[in-house]
Regions:
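C-terminal substrate-recognition "lid" of short-chain dehydrogenase/reductases
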Residues: 72-73, 109-137, 142
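Catalytic Tyr-X3-Lys loop
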Residues: 1-11, 32, 49, 56, ...
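Residue(s) in the substrate-gating loop at a strand-loop-helix junction
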Residues: 36
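Active-site loop-to-helix junction immediately N-terminal to the catalytic Tyr of the SDR YXXXK motif
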Residues: 42-50, 62, 86
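Short, flexible catalytic-loop segment of classical short-chain dehydrogenase/reductase
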Residues: 40, 57, 74, 78-89
């Protein structure tokens, strides 16, 4: 299930989007994949999820290089835990919440706005020289 959702879907959608971008007279564009901080670091008990997010990061790098000559940029946004209803459910487990927050030097989870702002930046002309990389929104987790 996670492989289909996190990797195959991203690959298939990107392929369709690239075909549309190549037909567009303006040429070029920006593809933004959703990854996770766990595409940059491992976490016990999350092996399949880690694998799929590392896969998205690899896909992004490969496509970023391959499509650069077509003026198509490919990047990822890789957040930590984001304040959503799903994360709120996870955080009802006090041990899990403490473990997660203790790994985030800033001591808080990301907001939906934090993620949306990064996506808007990558989609904008301000990011015209950024491709094949990831913006990690994790409060310092992966910097440790």
């Amino acid at each position: 299930y996670l492989v289909d959702l996190n990797m195959k879907a991203a690959f298939n959608v990107a392929q369709l989007v690239v075909l549309k971008m190549l037909k567009n007279k303006k040429k070029g564009g920006s593809i933004i994949n959703m990854s996770s901080q766990l595409g940059h670091v491992g976490m016990s008990g999350r092996n399949i999820y880690n694998m799929t997010k590392f896969g998205i990061e690899g896909l992004t790098k490969g496509m970023g290089v391959e499509l650069a000559t077509k003026n198509i940029r490919v990047n990822t946004v890789a957040p930590t835990f984001v304040e959503t209803p799903m994360v709120k459910k996870f955080f009802k487990n006090k041990k899990f919440k403490q473990l997660a927050l203790s790994n985030i030097p800033m001591g808080k989870v990301a907001t939906e706005s934090d993620v949306a702002t990064a996506v808007c930046f990558l989609a904008s002309d301000a990011a015209s020289m950024i491709t094949g990389t990831s913006i990690v929104i994790d409060g310092g987790w992966t910097a440790k």
